[in-house]
């Protein structure tokens, strides 16, 4: 019985590790969310940036496969990374307030050009 208990704990620990959210998952959700608004991030001009209001507490396997972020911000043709971050985060914050989701997520940087900036 004790062996069975430890085995079940080990299985649960491994399942949790496999269920962790990868930065690439966040990027995929971000790009899917942009496509929802008919914007293809990959074809935007260089010096582009993207931010999203990421609901970390509610992201599950289904959300990773099908979900979209409600609030997004992006910019392109921007002078440098600091201006790119500012543009993306400000746009995301505007959508976050407009959709009244201030308590469910926080706007965070996702991409600058093709560099992943997610802090998971």
Model-based region annotation:
Residues 1-17:
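Classical Sec-dependent N-terminal signal peptides that target proteins to the secretory pathway
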């Amino acid at each position: 019985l004790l062996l069975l208990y430890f085995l079940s704990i080990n299985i649960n620990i491994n399942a949790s590790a496999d269920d962790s959210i990868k930065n690439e998952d966040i990027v995929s959700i971000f790009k899917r969310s942009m496509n929802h608004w008919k914007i293809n991030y990959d074809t935007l001009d260089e010096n582009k940036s993207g931010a999203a209001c990421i609901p970390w507490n509610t992201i599950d396997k289904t959300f990773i496969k099908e979900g979209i972020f409600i609030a997004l911000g992006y910019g392109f043709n921007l002078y440098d990374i600091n201006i790119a971050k500012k543009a993306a985060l400000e746009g995301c914050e505007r959508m976050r307030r407009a959709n009244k989701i201030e308590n469910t997520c926080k706007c965070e940087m996702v991409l600058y050009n093709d560099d992943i900036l997610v802090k998971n």
